[in-house]
């Protein structure tokens, strides 16, 4: 199968993934998309233009990733079930389930290592949802601006986190890609955690890109200037630079990984992992 045919197949997969992410064909994905509403709210997953990078190691017949025997990359997600259907729903769902997580496993014939990016633990600064809610209470003109803050408490997670994933995806990689990813993980800076540009899902997506797969993992929110919070009308922003918020989230990443597994790009290893950790 030549590269043009593979490109057409992967482009079709991306289009189908975009349809599924906007809620036409899955029961859970509708929470990730909301068309522009009268109050100014909208939510839209950000879809990549190309699924594989130029140096991807693909099977010539199927167009799916291949690797060396015993070398694998796993991406794990813990989706917090955030509801992006409207401004009120997202605020309530974040308050009820403020944390999600994404992390990785690197496997070779001799070893299996688990890594992730952590932060936003609330010791040096209030956590994102706490800081934003505090600014709402204080009638700050731009309470949502707290989500633009950088947390100084980031660190490298080594080993299993203290909560199980909701999905585990595995893909084969070459020994060369394994070494490239390992060096990236070991040399990456973790001391800062940023919701918009440097969170746990960003780290997982970076690693996937080194394995030559571009994952759909970001969402774009258009925020209304005001919304109802706890039965009170509250200002969200006054300065228009806070109208658009883009960030990576396990919810979007997990939907994409599930679709990839259905397309035959990688595999669902959730049960394997949960059995392994019992």
Residue map of PLM features:
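Hydrophobic membrane-insertion alpha-helices, especially the h-region
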Residues: 17-22
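Glycine-rich catalytic cores of cysteine/serine-nucleophile enzymes that process amide/ester linkages
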Residues: 33-163
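Activation targets extended, charge/polar-rich intrinsically disordered C-terminal tails
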Residues: 29-61, 179-278
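Bacterial N-terminal signal peptides that target proteins for export
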Residues: 2-14
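Second-shell loop/turn segments in exported
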Residues: 90-93, 163-171, 186-195
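A structural motif
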Residues: 152-183
């Amino acid at each position: 199968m030549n590269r043009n045919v593979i490109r057409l197949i992967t482009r079709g997969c991306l289009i189908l993934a975009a349809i599924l992410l906007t809620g036409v064909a899955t029961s859970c994905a509708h929470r990730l998309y909301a068309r522009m509403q009268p109050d100014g709210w909208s939510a839209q997953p950000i879809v990549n233009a190309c699924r594989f990078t130029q140096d991807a190691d693909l099977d010539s017949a199927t167009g799916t990733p291949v690797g060396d025997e015993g070398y694998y990359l796993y991406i794990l997600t813990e989706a917090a079930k955030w509801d992006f259907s409207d401004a009120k729903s997202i605020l309530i769902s974040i308050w009820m389930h403020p944390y999600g997580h994404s992390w990785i496993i690197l496997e070779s014939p001799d070893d299996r290592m688990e890594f992730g990016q952590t932060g936003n633990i609330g010791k040096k600064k209030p956590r994102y949802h706490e800081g934003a809610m505090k600014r709402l209470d204080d009638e700050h003109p731009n309470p949502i601006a707290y989500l633009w803050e950088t947390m100084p408490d980031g660190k490298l997670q080594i080993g299993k986190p203290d909560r199980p994933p909701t999905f585990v995806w595995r893909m084969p990689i070459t020994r060369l890609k394994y070494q490239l990813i390992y060096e990236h993980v070991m040399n990456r800076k973790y001391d800062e955690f940023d919701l918009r540009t440097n969170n746990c899902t960003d780290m997982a997506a970076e690693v996937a890109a080194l394995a030559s797969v571009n994952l759909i993992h970001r969402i774009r929110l258009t925020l209304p200037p005001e919304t109802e919070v706890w039965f009170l009308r509250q200002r969200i922003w006054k300065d228009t630079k806070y109208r658009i918020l883009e960030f990576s989230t396990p919810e979007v990443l997990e939907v994409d990984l599930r679709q990839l597994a259905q397309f035959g790009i990688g595999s669902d290893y959730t049960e394997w992992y949960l059995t392994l950790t019992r």
